[in-house]
Amino acid sequence: MKASELRALDDAQLRAKLSEYKVELFNLRFQKATGKLTNTARPKQVKKDIARILTILRERELAQAELG
């Protein structure tokens, strides 16, 4: 998911996406361990999406602290 798409979401939606991606990453790791992972690039994509979400949430926290 692109960062611009993620920035359009509010905090609650971002946190929901974050939990979805964490569950997906867990399942992908499990598939890799059992040898059933077909798309080997997907775990890297999911990790990057998680990092993007965490970055956006942190940016918003810092902006709020700066304002208030």
Curated annotation (Swiss-Prot):
It comes from the Bacteria. InterPro entries: Ribosomal_protein_uL29, Ribosomal_uL29, Ribosomal_uL29_sf. One of its GO terms (biological process) is translation. The keyword Transcription does not apply. One of its GO terms (molecular function) is structural constituent of ribosome. HAMAP family: Ribosomal_uL29 (MF_00374). This is Large ribosomal subunit protein uL29. It comes from Chloroflexus aggregans (strain MD-66 / DSM 9485).
